[in-house]
A protein has these predicted regions:
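Bacterial Sec-dependent N-terminal signal peptides
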Residues: 1-25, 549
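Outer membrane beta-barrel
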Residues: 61-158, 185-187, 275-296, 467, ...
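Outer-membrane beta-barrel proteins
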Residues: 76, 80-87, 161-164, 248-261
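Hydrophobic, small-residue-rich alpha-helical packing segments that form membrane-like cores
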Residues: 132-219, 223-228, 233
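Short glycine/proline- and aromatic-enriched beta-strand/turn motifs that initiate or cap beta-hairpins
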Residues: 19-46, 362-364
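Short loop/turn motifs that connect adjacent beta-strands in outer-membrane beta-barrel proteins
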Residues: 14-26, 62-66, 99-108, 146-149, ...
Length: 549
């Protein structure tokens, strides 16, 4: 049936290739991830009620020169392991209609994704690997009719899985101005300066009843929560400086222990980039910035904002074993620096083909807090704590890694990485203390001929904490243009001595991609952008199909 849909949709798309002449164009995608699970008590999979688990999505968009309508069907009735209970369901939860005048005015009705600035006070988005879809159902207006000026206004109710919480609604506006558009001198000197400001209102039509334990005192929860954001981005030649400040009014919630302290965030970023050299330095201080459309829920759903992650996003398996989750409610001081340099060809360190080096440092600490006087033994209903702006608390996370990319011959390329990591498992996961580890990675890629490429990875993690040492190996053979064969094993050489083996075959043909695999997956956290989802251990047949047209 899916193949039939794909064929007919592709045919319709070919009928309208020239959108500029107001033809109708149909495009979309299908994504289906399937697990046929097996019980494996050695790795703690637990038992399953269903023989087949799947997360399946199908999107369709019909567009012309000025109009666009779209929707997404989701079948999550028997979801993959590790998603929250309310994630289960099926239907068409995402629909929209959009009008674009072609003269700087765009109007959208339905479900909206958007972001103000860096997302400190507003970001709605979809991230399927985490099970996040926090779209606003309502409307949005974008206006860019004036030179260098972009304005947007939106409002509606927020999606939380298969529920749209009508007990609250969200509205917001955002304005950005490119100052350089009004200065010929700035443009002549390659200077770009953008300033922006945002406002978000969260209104509760109905408030929860929260009583301080041991008393009859019910908290007077605010019906309106206001948030503001101002920012400035200046680019001069190869240099860029970004500064952003966000503030949120009182919002007692489950996340912050129902305290009345206001939230704030400051973000500073400076970068430089030229041929062969790049540098980035960032700092962020956030405090009590968990911001949801429902103040009593937990987990990863219902967020109106998203605090940017200041930890390096690793793609290798063992460096990603202990990923950092942004601590939005407690707050954090986060620092990140990155320096990259390309040694030129035919130099002592560059060799025949050149060498790429990169150093990344992430250092994240808590805030130094002094609790206020409790009421009946609890901080509920109080400001919670006092803090000094520049003082830091305990270490949450640290990652120092060095990476090298080196082409040794026309057919062989070598990547090396060393990483030193400190991971406060008690803060990030709830228990476990500080995990200190050292990780080494070697990746080789050998092009056998124009059709076949062999890639391999060897990784090792040393630690005296948690489950001890880990080893990882991978071999991958690509047979262009259609097939890829992969074998891997993650082995806990420390505490459990368990192997997490996996074998897969991936086939690609035009816009189709099909992966068939079998093996084990270890329990752990899947993270993206500082948001993490716990994924339990699993074993079985994995099937993944993707098609885009």
């Amino acid at each position: 049936m899916l193949a039939g849909i794909a064929f007919s949709s592709s045919a319709l798309a070919q009928d309208g290739e020239k959108k500029d002449k107001d033809y109708l164009v149909l495009h979309g995608s299908i994504q289906s991830d399937i697990l046929m699970p097996e019980v494996d008590n050695k790795i703690g999979t637990g038992t399953y009620k269903d023989d087949i688990l799947t997360n399946t999505y199908a999107e369709l968009t019909l567009a012309s020169k000025h109009f666009e309508v779209g929707g997404r069907f989701e079948f999550l009735e028997h979801p993959l392991p590790g998603f929250e209970n309310d994630f289960k369901g099926w239907g068409v939860p995402h629909i929209y209609a959009k009008y674009n005048s072609g003269k700087g005015v765009e109007v959208t009705l339905g479900d909206v994704y958007d972001q103000f600035g860096s997302g400190l006070i507003f970001r709605t988005y979809e991230e399927r690997s985490l099970g996040i879809d926090n779209a606003i159902r309502g409307g949005r207006v974008n206006i860019s009719a004036l030179k260098g000026v972009r304005f947007k206004a939106l409002g509606g109710v927020q999606r939380r899985y298969w529920d749209w919480d009508t007990d609250s609604w969200v509205a917001g506006t955002d304005l950005e101005i490119d100052i350089n558009q009004y200065s010929q001198k700035m443009r002549d000197n390659n200077v770009s300066w953008t300033i922006g400001g945002s406002y978000v209102l969260l209104n509760y039509e109905k408030n929860d009843q929260v009583v301080i334990p041991g008393t009859n005192y019910e908290l007077n929860l605010p019906s309106n929560v206001n948030a503001f954001d101002v920012r400035s981005s200046l680019t001069v030649g190869n240099y860029n400086i970004l500064a952003e400040y966000a503030w949120r009014s009182q919002d007692p919630s489950f996340d912050n222990g129902y305290i009345y302290r206001r939230g704030s965030a400051v973000l500073l970023s400076a970068s430089y980039s030229s041929k062969g050299v790049s540098a980035l330095v960032q700092a962020k201080r956030s405090e009590n910035m968990s911001f949801r459309s429902n103040r009593s829920i937990t987990g990863i759903s219902g967020f109106i904002n998203n605090m940017p992650a200041f930890a390096y996003q690793h793609t290798y398996s063992l460096p990603a074993l202990y990923p950092y989750a942004t601590q939005a409610a407690p707050g954090e001081w986060a620092f990140q620096g990155e320096f990259g340099y390309n040694f030129k060809r035919h130099t002592a360190l560059g060799g025949k083909y050149g060498t790429k080096m990169k150093l990344n440092i992430s250092h994240i600490r808590g805030l130094d807090k002094s609790p206020v006087e409790p009421v009946n033994g609890t901080l509920m209903g109080t400001d919670g704590y006092e803090t000094c702006f520049f003082k830091t608390g305990e270490l949450y996370y640290q990652d120092i890694n060095v990476q090298m990319e080196k082409k040794l011959s026309k057919s062989f390329k070598l990547n090396l990485m060393y990483m030193n990591q400190k991971y406060n498992k008690t803060v990030i996961e709830g228990e476990g203390g500080m995990v200190k580890s050292n990780i080494a990675v070697a990746e080789g890629k050998y092009q056998i001929n124009k059709k076949f490429t062999l890639r391999s990875e060897l990784q090792y993690l040393w630690t005296n904490e948690d489950q001890g040492d880990w080893a990882f190996g991978l071999v991958e053979l690509s047979a262009l243009p259609y097939l890829m064969f992969t074998l891997s094993d993650m082995w806990n050489t420390g505490e459990t001595n368990q192997h997490y083996y996996m074998g897969s075959v991936t086939a690609t043909y035009k816009a189709h991609r099909l992966m068939l695999g079998y093996g084990r997956t270890r329990a752990g956290y899947n993270c993206s952008g500082g948001v993490c989802r716990y994924v339990p251990a699993s074993k079985g047949v994995n099937i993944s199909y993707n098609y885009t047209f």
